Structures are given as structure tokens and as C-alpha cells.
């Protein structure tokens, strides 16, 4: 089975800041798309996925501070308790930077398992802040979306690595 992840012998080009900013914008807009019923249960936090991807792939370009501001941006757009996404995204970014080398050693599907843990922790942190703020506990289906996000991880990684790949790969096998 072919692997679409960056191979060890392949050197990726650095990501362009404009490309990173556009992917952040698309993640933000994807979070704002309305979903109802079962689709709402399956909808992952796209902005968290993009933040996680860039913190793992380009840690010098995306860090805890940028994740914090993206979280504040999400809080304002969601009209939720101010700071809940900011805290969760900042902790997610720190965790991604901490486990970065470990995650990069795995294939995309093994990375997805690691990403699932990070996304579940992020969702639990948002839930904790909501509950402390007085919101009722959601149903168990609240934790389905982070698992769907982990399943989206390989596709997201392939799509975001495409512009970074060299034009012609002349690697001898």
C-alpha cells in the first residue's frame, strides 16, 4: 500500500506564510458552516486540526501564541464563553509541539491515533470550561467529532503537504 506521507528521503519545501494563513482561514470558515442533526455530531473542529497540523509540521511558523489568538477568534465567532477555545487551542499547540518528533515518526494512520488523543483532550478541555461556566453536560456523542477529526487527519496531511512537495521527485528507490 503506498504511503502518501512525506518519505524520510524526501525533503519538503518550507510552507509559505500566506498558504498557512489561508488554511487557517479555511479551517475557521469550515467551523462556522452550519450543521444539523447527525452531521453536527460528526463535524470535527477543523481549526483545531489545522492548528495541530501546522504546529507539528512548521513549529516555527505556528505556535502557542498564534493558537491562542485563533481560539479567541473562534470564541468571538461562536459567541461562546470567551477564552474556552483560546485555552484549548493553546494547550493543543503546546502538546503538538511537545509530541512533534514522536508523531512525525509514524505513518499517517498511526499519526491519526495520536491526533485522536490530542483532539479528545482539546474537546475535553473546552467541555470543562463550558461546564465550569454553567453549561449543562452534553451527551456522549460530543466526543465523536474528535474521532472523526482523527479520521480526517490523513487526508488533511496529504492535502496540506502537496504544495510543499518538490516539483519532480527523482529519488532512486
Residue ranges: model-predicted function:
Residues 1-173:
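Terminal, non-globular segments
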Amino acid at each position: 500500500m503506498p504511503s502518501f506521507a512525506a518519505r524520510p528521503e524526501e525533503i519538503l519545501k518550507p510552507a509559505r506564510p500566506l498558504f498557512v494563513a489561508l488554511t487557517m482561514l479555511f479551517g475557521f470558515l469550515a467551523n462556522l458552516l452550519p450543521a444539523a442533526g447527525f452531521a453536527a455530531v460528526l463535524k470535527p473542529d477543523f481549526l483545531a486540526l489545522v492548528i495541530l497540523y501546522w504546529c507539528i509540521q512548521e513549529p516555527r511558523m505556528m505556535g502557542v501564541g498564534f493558537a491562542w489568538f485563533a481560539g479567541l477568534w473562534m470564541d468571538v465567532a461562536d459567541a461562546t464563553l470567551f477564552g474556552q477555545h483560546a485555552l484549548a487551542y493553546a494547550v493543543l499547540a503546546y502538546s503538538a509541539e511537545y509530541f512533534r518528533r514522536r508523531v512525525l515518526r509514524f505513518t499517517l494512520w498511526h499519526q491519526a491515533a495520536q491526533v485522536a488523543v490530542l483532539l479528545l483532550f482539546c474537546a475535553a478541555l473546552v467541555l470543562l470550561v463550558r461546564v465550569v461556566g454553567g453549561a449543562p453536560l452534553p451527551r456522549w456523542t460530543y466526543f465523536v467529532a474528535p474521532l472523526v477529526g482523527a479520521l480526517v487527519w490523513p487526508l488533511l496531511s496529504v492535502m496540506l503537504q502537496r504544495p510543499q512537495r518538490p516539483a519532480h521527485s527523482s529519488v532512486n528507490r
